[in-house]
Amino acid sequence: MAELTISSDEIRSAIESYTQSYTPETSIEEVGVVTDTSDGIAHVSGLPSAMANELLEFPGGVLGVALNLEDREIGAVILGEFAEIEEGQQVRRTGDVLSVPVGDKFLGRVVNPLGQPIDGLGEIEAEEQRVLELQAATVLQRQPVEEPLATGITAIDALTAIGRGQRQLIIGDRKTGKTAVCIDAILNQKANWETGDPTKQVRCIYVAIGQKGSTIAGVKAALEEHGALEYTTIVAAPASDSAGFKWLAPYTGSAIGQHWMYQGKHVLIVFDDLTKQAEAYRAISLLLRRPPGREAYPGDVFYLHSRLLERCAKLSDEMGGGSMTGLPIIETKANDISAFIPTNVISITDGQVFLESDLFNKGVRPAINVGTSVSRVGGAAQTKGMKKVAGSLRLEMAQYRELEAFSAFASDLDAASLAQLERGARWVELLKQDQYSPVPVEDQIVSIFLVDQGYYDSVPVGDIRRFNAELLEDLHRSAADAFKSIEGGKVLEGEAAEAIKAATDKFKQGFLASDGSRVVNEAAAGELGHEEVESLSVTRKHVEK
């Protein structure tokens, strides 16, 4: 029988080989326990190493965000369905802070505040993950707002112009057309998008916070119908969502926009509306037992909005020159703009467009109150052509509103006042616009120029909108070269201005008012100065049968 021999070297090498290839199946992780839960908030004991804003994993794959870090427990906001979360369940750390996927594939899609698609069109291929709580651009990384962003709304482009990188507040009571103004601004970017020029293209983001599901579906349908959905992303946190989703939705939208901004691209983002975000944050804070302040809002509600809106900027050329323009919407109660949230956001933004319910009910739409609406960027964000023709429009409109209120109590008015009322009524009609019908800047300049020069004075007020629409259609044919010379908002002057005037004179000869009368083709009255007005014989209408 052969002798069995075992080499010690073979034994050693076999053991070494086994130990090197062995992978332990156990791991160390922190596990917490839900101590109580209600209304989308969970208190978790344990997890001593959890970070602020860290994602926590609850049973069933439900995620939460660690907001309150206390000695013995964590206060977390549950993102998603919280009905199944119960006391005693285990909670695990993920090691990740809150972030969302971003990229060009998000254009044309509807996502929730976690960046997950909810439009039934399949998964979205992300380019990268972007942290939600990201520091805004520093002062040295910015440049002044000087590049205009046309909204297609004559009243805004002429009176409270918006520039790329600006934050312009849209404020007013419910049902005054706030959302419609912002949707029109998105629709007006279609012409720039179709050029294919990256310096002109504007990517749009519409953030719906606490809106009815049917309202969000209506916005999506309107964008789709007008061909604007291809360059727009919708971030939806409808009224049925938890307070956590409504709180996060604006930050998700801004993270998607910042991704493009830091690539040197231009972005327009609409927050509809931040009042509901503040109310959701108030609910979260009260449930987390944070001390309430004015109107029961927590002490950091100003920071909630300031750190969001400060992300809108026009970056310096060294940073790529990209921009993100913000249109936050705030809903007021009974036109009270002195309430807590409205005053907070007014102080953060670069101006506001105030929509008034009284004007809206009178049929003035968009119902913009010229007296309380302002752009702190001012003429820097206007094209040269618009700045020239609309320079005195704000003053004229303010004087008209004041005189209109006075005339309600006065029976006899002098010629100057009558002339101002007649001209003001025509300005009001010109600034009215139908929904989803943005006006190109060239058409705006020509219309304002002709009213300013007195060409609309002989047209009955009730026919102004029809006259303006038919005149512009005719001018695009008969004075096409003049329109080409003011493309991009160039100044209307010289031969182009004379061609517009001549074509307008010719058009007026064939225009019939609604009562069948012909508009007299009188010489342009020009701007109505005080000395000229006093010597001017003013009548209510100039028509000849």
Swiss-Prot record:
Topology relative to the lipid bilayer, per the entry, is: Peripheral membrane protein
List the GO terms this entry assigns under cellular component, sorted alphabetically.
plasma membrane; proton-transporting ATP synthase complex
Q: Which GO terms describe its molecular function?
A: ADP binding; ATP binding; proton-transporting ATP synthase activity, rotational mechanism
Note the site residues: Required for activity: 373
Disulphides = none
Q: Give residues annotated as binding ATP.
A: 172-179
Identify its protein family: Belongs to the ATPase alpha/beta chains family.
What is the protein's quaternary organization?
F-type ATPases have 2 components, CF(1) - the catalytic core - and CF(0) - the membrane proton channel. CF(1) has five subunits: alpha(3), beta(3), gamma(1), delta(1), epsilon(1). CF(0) has three main subunits: a(1), b(2) and c(9-12). The alpha and beta chains form an alternating ring which encloses part of the gamma chain. CF(1) is attached to CF(0) by a central stalk formed by the gamma and epsilon chains, while a peripheral stalk is formed by the delta and b chains.
PANTHER family attached to this UniProt entry: ATP SYNTHASE SUBUNIT ALPHA, MITOCHONDRIAL (PTHR48082:SF2)
The protein here is known as: ATP synthase subunit alpha
- Taxonomic source organism: Nocardia farcinica (strain IFM 10152)
* Gene name, Swiss-Prot/TrEMBL: atpA
